[in-house]
Amino acid sequence: MVLPLILTLVIVAPIFLWMYSWYISAIPKHYVKPGTKLQKKVHSNLRILEQKYHPSWWCPFGTTQTVVRQIFRDCPSLPFTREIVEFDDGGAAGIDWLIPEGADDTTPIVVFLPGITGSTHDSSYVLHPVKEARDKGWKCVVVNPRGLGGVKLRTTRTYNAATPHDFAFIAKMINERYPDAKKLGCGFSMGGMILWNYLAMTGENADLDGGMIVSSPWDPLVASDSIECFIPQLIFNSFIAKNLVDMVRPYRELFKDMVDFDEVCRCNTVRGFDRSFVIPMYGFKSCDDYYRQATLATKVDKIKIPCVTLNSVDDYFSPVECIPTLDIMESDYVCGIITNHGGHTAFMESADPNARGMVEKLLSQWGNMIFHDYS
């Protein structure tokens, strides 16, 4: 009895998953203000908005996609060149350049911002889009926050989602070095929050020509509630909290007079880490105050360069009800894209976790628009 049952499941389960993945496939919803230049350019350049998004047949669910991409997607070895950026306060960060053959001072540049504890060589969700951009002939630079990417902290300043001043410094440096090159910022998760808050802070004076935000939480308070539910807490939140603690653990002596380091080391949620480390470090009144200042949803009207956002309904980190679609529809500069499936930064389409997915396709098409069809 057991063997026939197992054989039946082995045969039936893949068929069911394949049929289910096609059943749930749908054209992504998109939100863009009618009659604007942005709408015309989006409709003529973003072919992905005309095609159904087919999640991977064996991995159609958001949570499994996120886990599979994280565990099984490789980190391609790319010939980056490291540059150390020295900040005015004595701190430093590492940025990694990837320059294609034949590039010159006018070659377009994509500036990548990894997620909360991500850096150049350990973030497959960044490296595959970097490879996509490089293959298009674009220069790439990955911006690692202070304390990550192999550059040790020199001061007590780290990074947070509400304070994009380090990125502003780097974006200005890149723009001054390559004034004749168009530049696109591409941020993932918390990196997207930093990018969005930079664009909101600088408005039309941004040192970028366009933005792309992938899987960023629109409201950090609601996102924190979401990832503290049982399943995401077990799979994601506790893992990220451990990475955050491990990131600052070597600097106990540096921070001993500023935070309760024993409390920091006991954190098992992102909110707990924010409460015990980020809040006292940056002088926020509370987590609510920090999250209010970091939120994206209230700043759509402050974005003054073309920016596309990509989110999935089944992403625990970015509850879809927080996406300000009405505000986006009133903006001349923001296009919001929402898929029913895709998880957090995953957006798998092939059975192969390493294969090109929706993020790479969007980067290619949006980048072409910004660099060659938006002036």
UniProtKB/Swiss-Prot annotation:
Pfam families, per database record: Abhydrolase_1
Xref: SUPFAM superfamilies: alpha/beta-Hydrolases
Enzyme Commission number(s) from the entry: 3.1.1.-
Record GO biological process: medium-chain fatty acid biosynthetic process; medium-chain fatty acid catabolic process
Gene3D superfamilies: alpha/beta hydrolase
Annotated ranges, domain AB hydrolase-1: 108-203
Molecular function via GO: acetylesterase activity; monoacylglycerol lipase activity
Coiled-coil residue spans: none
Sorted UniProt keywords: Hydrolase, Serine esterase
Family: Belongs to the AB hydrolase superfamily. AB hydrolase 4 family.
PANTHER family xrefs: ABHYDROLASE DOMAIN-CONTAINING PROTEIN (PTHR10794), ALPHA_BETA HYDROLASE 1, ISOFORM A (PTHR10794:SF63)
Protein name: Protein abhd-3.2
Organism listed in the record: Caenorhabditis elegans
UniProt lineage: Eukaryota, Metazoa, Ecdysozoa, Nematoda, Chromadorea
